[in-house]
Design a protein with these regions (language model features):
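Conserved AMP-binding/adenylation subdomain of ANL enzymes
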Residues: 1-14, 22-63, 77
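Beta->alpha turn/N-cap motifs
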Residues: 67-68, 172-173
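Short Gly/Pro-enriched turn/cap motifs at secondary-structure boundaries
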Residues: 138-144, 158, 188-192
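Acidic/polar helix N-cap motif
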Residues: 48, 153-155, 181, 185
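Conserved beta-loop-beta connector loops within the AMP-binding
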Residues: 150-168, 187-188
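Gly/Ser/Thr-rich phosphate-binding loop
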Residues: 36, 53, 58-66, 72-136, ...
């Protein structure tokens, strides 16, 4: 499902569902995967750091996905029991770059290592995952099955390892184009 390396989400999981379902992260990663694999989803109407932590503990949530701002808010709650997230076995950060300081604060406070992948709405959204790879904190891991990824220069040629470039990808999860907007589609998609 959302992870690779044998530690996937499954029917015994309880998923924290606080992300808005109008966003691809909430719709596909949280709700869609949960429905597909049979996980229970604890739907939360509005994020509040304290009541969110209490809900995770009360309902035995095992999978939490959220943006760095959510994780930072949880790490910033004063006087919270460090074991309040002890039921969580998968902790995923997405929707924005995860600052190293936030990852470190969450690990120091709760003993949880955050996994940060890479994705975008146009790729439904997951492209890479560090789960099961041993990738260090700050790495987005490797491509998920079926996705091919290249980093290229301005001419579309592959760059050397360590050089900056633009991410190009393809796979069955990549969209066919923007609805009724051929110009926008042509600006981001190539024939190959």
């Amino acid at each position: 499902a959302i992870a690779s390396g044998g530690d996937e989400q499954g029917p015994d999981d309880v998923v924290f569902g606080v992300l808005p379902l109008f966003h691809i992260f909430g719709l596909n990663v949280v709700l869609g995967v949960s429905l597909f694999v049979g996980s229970a989803v604890l739907l939360i109407e509005r994020f509040d750091p304290v009541s969110g932590l209490e809900a995770v503990e009360k309902h035995g949530v095992t999978v939490v996905s959220g943006p760095p701002t959510m994780w930072a808010a949880w790490a910033g709650v004063p006087g919270v029991d460090p074991g309040i997230l002890s039921s969580v076995r998968m902790a995923i950060s997405g929707a924005a770059k995860l600052p190293v300081e936030v990852a470190q604060a969450v690990e120091a406070k709760f003993g949880i290592e955050l996994d940060e992948g890479y994705g975008l709405t146009e790729a439904s959204p997951v492209v890479t995952s560090p789960r099961g790879t041993g990738a260090p904190s700050g790495s987005i891991g490797i491509t998920v099955p079926g996705v091919e990824l290249r980093i290229v220069d301005a001419q579309g040629e592959d760059v050397l390892v360590g050089d900056a470039g633009e991410i190009w990808l393809r796979g069955p999860n990549v969209f066919a184009g923007y609805w009724q907007d051929d110009d926008a589609t042509a600006a981001v998609l190539t024939d190959d």
